[in-house]
Amino acid sequence: MSEFLTHPFEPFFDKDSKILILGSFPSVKSRQDGFYYQHPRNRFWPILETLFDVRLENITEQQAFLRKKHIALWDVLQSCKIKNSDDKTISYAKANDLSPILSQTKIQAIFTTGQSAYKFFIKFHPRLKAVRGILKRTCNYP
């Protein structure tokens, strides 16, 4: 059964963030743990670990890594109706306002983590379409 949810945690960024990576909406596991991409099947952290040759054992290490690399994380959606963690079930979507994070940082590129995030990004933030570096797919579950 789908339930209407509001995003449970804040965006992760600091004033030196240069890259913004946007997901669609947190998974059940991420909502439980209070941080982004915590579902064990999500490829987000393994991809970053491989790209940067690091091992990130916990949320504290993930956050330190993101700060060091000037990466900000947030989700396109502020609230939606969703069943479990299935992006295909999202309805009644309401977007996060990206202007606070964009005005407080040095964001130079915005990436999305999958098809749903990209679709909602384009729908809700059409004026940002020209921002370089929009990636359509990176972290879909098998």
What residue spans do the PLM features occupy?
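Glycine/proline-rich loop-helix segments at beta-alpha junctions forming the active-site rim
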Residues: 2-6, 11, 80-142
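Structured helix-beta-strand junction loops
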Residues: 15-16, 69, 104-105
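Hydrophobic/aromatic beta-strand patches that form the interior of the parallel beta-sheet core
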Residues: 20, 72-74, 111, 139
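Short loop/turn segments at strand-loop or loop-helix junctions that form parts
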Residues: 24, 76-78, 142
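Catalytic metal-binding/acid-base residues of hydrolase active sites
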Residues: 25-26, 57, 116-117
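Short, surface-exposed acidic-centric catalytic microdomains
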Residues: 29-90
